[in-house]
C-alpha cells in the first residue's frame, strides 16, 4: 500500500493549485475508461524514488459560517485518520486566520506528521514576516512555498520522503485473498462482514487496520483464508449534500489499492447512485476484479427472476466499464447467498491471474481477424501480426501490427470480446494494447 499524503486547509488557500503542480502532467487521464468520471481527487506520484498517493481535499465552498466550520472540522478529522502525512496549507499573503488555528488544533490532537505549507510565498526575503506568523501554530515542519510558481515544492517533497522513509508499512500476507468491501454509507458493508465472520465460519483474528475505524477481519471458509477489508464507520451524509462525497471516496481508495478482489455493495432498495458510480469507477481505474452486490434483496417486494434480469441490464447500462463484473443479489442481514461471494471471489481471482499460451492466443486472434479485419483508415491497410500476454493481475495483451496508432477503440473492444468468449476472464478487467511489430 502506497503512503497517502493529504492536502488540507481552509478554502482559497491554494490547495488545488498545489495538488495540480505536484502531480504534473499526470493530471490528464490518458487511458480513460468510458463512463468513468474524470474529476478524480487523487493521483499516484513519485519523488526521489518514493511512490505515494497525493489526495486533494478541495471543493469545499462555504455557504455560511456554520456550514464552513463543520466541513473544515470534518475535513481535518478525515485527513488525520486516513493520511500517513498531512500537508496543511495556509495563505501566507492573507496571514493567520482563525480557521487555520481551528484546523491546527484538530491536527495536533493526533500523532500524525504534519508539514505546514505557508503558500503564496514567491520571495521569502520580501515576505519572511508573513511566514513567521505561522510558527506559533506549533508544527515541527514549516516550509514557505508557492504552489502556483512551484517555489520550494522540492524541499517540501524531500521532507515528505524523509518522513515516509522512517515509517513501517507492514507487508501483506500473499497467502490470503484480500477482499475490499466498498460502497457508500448504509449499503450494508459491515453487516456483510459480520455475517461472513459469523458462527458458520471461524474468525482467526481481528487486526486493527491502518485507520481508526477500519477493521481487517481474517476468516476461514472451506479451508481457504480471506482477509476482509471493511471501510466501516464511513460518515453518514452531511445535512448539506456534497457532490464529491470525498470521505467515502478516500476510504474506498485505500481499501481498493490493498485488495485482490473488490466487492461493491449497492442498496437494492435505493438503486444505483452517483456515489456508487464514483466508487465503482475507482475500482475500475485501479484495474481490480470486482463483484457487484445488490444487498437488502430481502426487502425488495414483488420480485422474481425477471426482476433480477431487469436490474442486471440496468446496472450494466449505467456501469458499462464493469460489463465483465458478476452481479449477485444477497441479504447481508439474513445471510442469503452471502457465502457465494467468497466462492465467486476465488473464481474471478483465478481469472485475474490466468495466463494464456501464445499459441492458443494467436489461434483465437487469427480467427477473430479473419471474421472481422481491422477497417482501412486513411488509405492504409492494417495488418495484425501476432499477440502475446505480457502480464497477469490484470491480464495484459500486446498485439503487434503495422499501424497501431490507427486502431480504433471499437476494434480493440471487438478483440477484447473475442478473447473473453474464448478464455473467460469473468470478473476480471483485461488490458489490450497495440504496438509496432518488431523489425525481425
Swiss-Prot record:
EngA-type G domain ranges (all copies): 3-168, 177-353
Pfam families registered for this protein in UniProt: KH_dom-like, MMR_HSR1
Presence of keyword Transferase: no
Binding residue positions for GTP 2: 183-190, 230-234, 295-298
Domain KH-like intervals: 354-438
Keyword annotations from UniProtKB, A to Z: GTP-binding, Nucleotide-binding, Repeat, Ribosome biogenesis
Cystine connections: none
SUPFAM superfamilies listed in its UniProt record: P-loop containing nucleoside triphosphate hydrolases (SSF52540)
CDD domains in UniProt: EngA1, EngA2
Chain positions recorded as GTP 1 binding sites: 9-16, 56-60, 119-122
One MF term in the entry's GO annotations: GTP binding
Family annotation (InterPro entries): G_ENGA, GTP-bd, GTPase_Der, KH_dom-like, KH_dom-like_a/b, P-loop_NTPase, Small_GTP-bd
The UniProt record lists the keyword Repeat: yes
Subunit structure: Associates with the 50S ribosomal subunit.
Functional summary from the UniProt entry: GTPase that plays an essential role in the late steps of ribosome biogenesis.
Family named by the database record: Belongs to the TRAFAC class TrmE-Era-EngA-EngB-Septin-like GTPase superfamily. EngA (Der) GTPase family.
The name this protein goes by in its record: GTPase Der
Record organism: Fusobacterium nucleatum subsp. nucleatum (strain ATCC 25586 / DSM 15643 / BCRC 10681 / CIP 101130 / JCM 8532 / KCTC 2640 / LMG 13131 / VPI 4355)
Amino acid at each position: 500500500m502506497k503512503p497517502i499524503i493529504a492536502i488540507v486547509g481552509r478554502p482559497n488557500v491554494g490547495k488545488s493549485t498545489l495538488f495540480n503542480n505536484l502531480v504534473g502532467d499526470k493530471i490528464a487521464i490518458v487511458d480513460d475508461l468510458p463512463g468513468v468520471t474524470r474529476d478524480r481527487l487523487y493521483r499516484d506520484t513519485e519523488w526521489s524514488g518514493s511512490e505515494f498517493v497525493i489526495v486533494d481535499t478541495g471543493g469545499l465552498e462555504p455557504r455560511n459560517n456554520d456550514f464552513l466550520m463543520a466541513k473544515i472540522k470534518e475535513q481535518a478529522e478525515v485527513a488525520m485518520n486516513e493520511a500517513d502525512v498531512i500537508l496543511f496549507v495556509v495563505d501566507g499573503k492573507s496571514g493567520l486566520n482563525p480557521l487555520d488555528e481551528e484546523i491546527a488544533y484538530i491536527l495536533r490532537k493526533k500523532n500524525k506528521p504534519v508539514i505546514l505549507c505557508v503558500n503564496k510565498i514567491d520571495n521569502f526575503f520580501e515576505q519572511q514576516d508573513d511566514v513567521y506568523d505561522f510558527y506559533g501554530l506549533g508544527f515541527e515542519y514549516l516550509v514557505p512555498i508557492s504552489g502556483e510558481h512551484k517555489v520550494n515544492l522540492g524541499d517540501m517533497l524531500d521532507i515528505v520522503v524523509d518522513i515516509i522513509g522512517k515509517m513501517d508499512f507492514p507487508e501483506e500476507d500473499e497467502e490470503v485473498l484480500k477482499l475490499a468491501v466498498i460502497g457508500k454509507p448504509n449499503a450494508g458493508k459491515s453487516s456483510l462482514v459480520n455475517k461472513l465472520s459469523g458462527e458458520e465460519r471461524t474468525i482467526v483474528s481481528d487486526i486493527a487496520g491502518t485507520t481508526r475505524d477500519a477493521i481487517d477481519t481474517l476468516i476461514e471458509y472451506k479451508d481457504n483464508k480471506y482477509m476482509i477489508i471493511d471501510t466501516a464507520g464511513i460518515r453518514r451524509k452531511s445535512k448539506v449534500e456534497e457532490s464529491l462525497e470525498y470521505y467515502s471516496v478516500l476510504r474506498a481508495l485505500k481499501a481498493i489499492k490493498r485488495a485482490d478482489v473488490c466487492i461493491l455493495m449497492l442498496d437494492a432498495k435505493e438503486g444505483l447512485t452517483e456515489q456508487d458510480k464514483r466508487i465503482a469507477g475507482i475500482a475500475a481505474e485501479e484495474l481490480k476484479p470486482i463483484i457487484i452486490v445488490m444487498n437488502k434483496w430481502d426487502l425488495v417486494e414483488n420480485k422474481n427472476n425477471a426482476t433480477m434480469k431487469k436490474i442486471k441490464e440496468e446496472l450494466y447500462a449505467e456501469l458499462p466499464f464493469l460489463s465483465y463484473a458478476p452481479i449477485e443479489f444477497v441479504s447481508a442481514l439474513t445471510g442469503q447467498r452471502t457465502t457465494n461471494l467468497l466462492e465467486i471471489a476465488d473464481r474471478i481471482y483465478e481469472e485475474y491471474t490466468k495466463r494464456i499460451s501464445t499459441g492458443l492466443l494467436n489461434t483465437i486472434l487469427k480467427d477473430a481477424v479473419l471474421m472481422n479485419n481491422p477497417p482501412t483508415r486513411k488509405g492504409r491497410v492494417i495488418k495484425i501480426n501476432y499477440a502475446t500476454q505480457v502480464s497477469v493481475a490484470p491480464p495484459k495483451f500486446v498485439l503487434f501490427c503495422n499501424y497501431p496508432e490507427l486502431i480504433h477503440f471499437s476494434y480493440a473492444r471487438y478483440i477484447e470480446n473475442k478473447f473473453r468468449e474464448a478464455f473467460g476472464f469473468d470478473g476480471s478487467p483485461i488490458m489490450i494494447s497495440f504496438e509496432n511489430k518488431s523489425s525481425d
